[in-house]
């Protein structure tokens, strides 16, 4: 907030469910600058597809598309991700940028650094994906994310048990 005025407000709550390492369902509600958004995604075992009911997309999609919550390392292999905020399908390019050492809370991690970008170049700038993600090389644990959207944002691992 600046001079008592909120410049950006974001609140989200989500649940992602897997059984035997297989995606079952995801649900989220998000308030972003007073706009309500949601995403509900279910795996339909009979049709072998994902059913998406979101504020930006409703329909079925490939079961190999992954919810864009970043913790699932398999996202680096996916042709598209599903927005955890709105259910929007985001076709992506993933580029490996190299290995890097990152220190967080006095602990050093050897990481693999990736850039995720929208493969659809016609999207408006505010809809384009352009996010850097770092995964621990040994465990594939999500260590860090950064992106530039209404300012530079960086998320880092706080602790890991």
Predicted regions, residues:
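Acidic, serine/threonine-rich low-complexity disordered tracts
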Residues: 1-44, 74-161
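Hydrophobic, well-structured mid-protein blocks that either form specific transmembrane helices
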Residues: 26-70
């Amino acid at each position: 907030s600046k001079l008592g005025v909120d410049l950006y407000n974001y609140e989200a709550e989500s649940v992602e469910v897997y059984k035997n390492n297989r995606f079952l369902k995801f649900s989220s509600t998000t308030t972003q600058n007073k706009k309500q958004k949601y995403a509900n995604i279910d795996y339909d075992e009979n049709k072998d597809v994902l059913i998406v009911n979101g504020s930006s997309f409703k329909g079925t999609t490939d079961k190999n598309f992954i919810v864009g919550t970043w913790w699932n390392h398999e996202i680096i292999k996916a042709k598209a991700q599903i927005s955890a905020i709105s259910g929007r399908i985001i076709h992506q390019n993933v580029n490996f940028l190299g290995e890097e050492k990152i220190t967080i809370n006095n602990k050093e991690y050897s990481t693999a650094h990736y850039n995720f970008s929208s493969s659809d170049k016609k999207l408006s700038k505010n809809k384009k994906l352009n996010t850097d993600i770092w995964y621990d090389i040994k465990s594939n644990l999500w260590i860090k994310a950064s992106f530039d959207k209404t300012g530079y944002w960086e998320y880092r691992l706080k602790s890991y048990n």
